[in-house]
Amino acid sequence: MIATSLPSPGVIAAAVIGALAIVAALALLIRRRPDAFPLLAVLALPFRLPISTGGRTVNLLIPLYLLIAAGILTRLASRGDSGAADRRRQGRSGERANVSPPWLARLLTPRGLEWLLLGAVVLYGVQALYSADHTKAAENLAFFYIPFGLLFALLRDVQWTRALVLRCLAVAVALAVIFAGIGFIEYYRKSLFLNPKVVAANEYDNYFRVNSLFFDPSIYGRFLALVMIALTTVVLWTRSRRELLIGAGVLAWLMAGMITSFSESSIAALLLGLAVLAAYRWDLLTTVYISGALLAIAAVILLASPASLHFGLKGSGGSANNATSGRTNLVSGGLELFAKRPLEGYGSGSFETEYKRHSDTTAENATSASHTIPVTIAAEQGIPGLAVYLALLLVGFFVLFSGAGRSPPRIALAACFAALVLHTWTYADFLEDPLTWTLLGIGVALARE
């Protein structure tokens, strides 16, 4: 990983002045062209810069932070014109689901989702007070939860049109195509541009994993999977033969890029997203039958495959734990932490510290163990955090899926969110990923249209 330590005060001052100038320029652009904000947000989503301080390296989305600051500045400067935005925000916030009791009907609304997101951030902050790793908790709040919450609010108030949605998708697809191309270069050269940890791991594996300009192959695969799901929506619902052929070609390119990442979690997320699209496009029952048949075939192949294919079920040390890259044992260790302190947990951001302390394991294993989000939340935040997380998933799925049947953009968002949630169950980052807040922000806006 290319890490930079904090520079001299003079350099910091110059950087601050430059950042302020960039924010001012972006704010002026957004003020004149409101549609520029969502387009630039999609453009900035993947780009992280590694900053080293206090003995650890944090990969920060500096371009996205600058854009969010510009968006907030524009919002503050145009408060006198905020009536339309307020009306859009309130448009369907009072519309309730046809369920009982009344409190549940109020919860299953876009406004209910907003309150749950706010509650998740507040609870995380409160539970950071007794965490064994205050620094990690503070970093997550300052660099992820709070700025991404602002991103959610800004995207929620955008006037989304079909043309704007397609332009944002075009930006995401262009990025994915470029990233996949860079990944092909890495695979051909057997050399990565970023992250020496992956380089070191590749020296011991029987295959070479690429991560393009991301700092992790699985996060790279996650991005490709979500873009592919969104693009597949266009392919399935288009009436243009030209769009169909171009989309199919791009999907083949991106699929090849995902394969070079060797991210099983990303492939699983992609398959779930495609299953959701198929259920909407054709028939739910048929989709279930086909999906079940494919899963059965995959299971037979997995069980019958020779050890030389390295699936981990056969050969020396073959087991379910080995097949899941050691995830089974790591998850069980996280559940043991939850069992020891189920009510309040060990505090926000403390999972790796507490896992090392109780399991007497390496920092690398502790980091891997934290890559199953429900287990991490249970261990860190106990029953309260787990309850908020489950409620957030329930309401999020309800808001995104409810009424999405006639709107391809909403179907795409729902499928992408389902895929993202599955990916976080086998890898890291849920509310720490701006993609989560982006999908929910756009989804809430479209649900109120």
PLM regions and their residue ranges:
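N-terminal signal-anchor transmembrane segment
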Residues: 1-78, 126-130, 420-422, 436-438
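Aromatic-anchored transmembrane helix interface
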Residues: 63-65, 112-120, 134-157, 176
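A membrane-periplasm/extracellular boundary helix in multi-pass inner-membrane enzymes
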Residues: 76-79, 181-190, 258-260, 278-324, ...
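Long extracytoplasmic/lumenal interhelical loops at the membrane interface
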Residues: 193, 308-310, 317-332, 336, ...
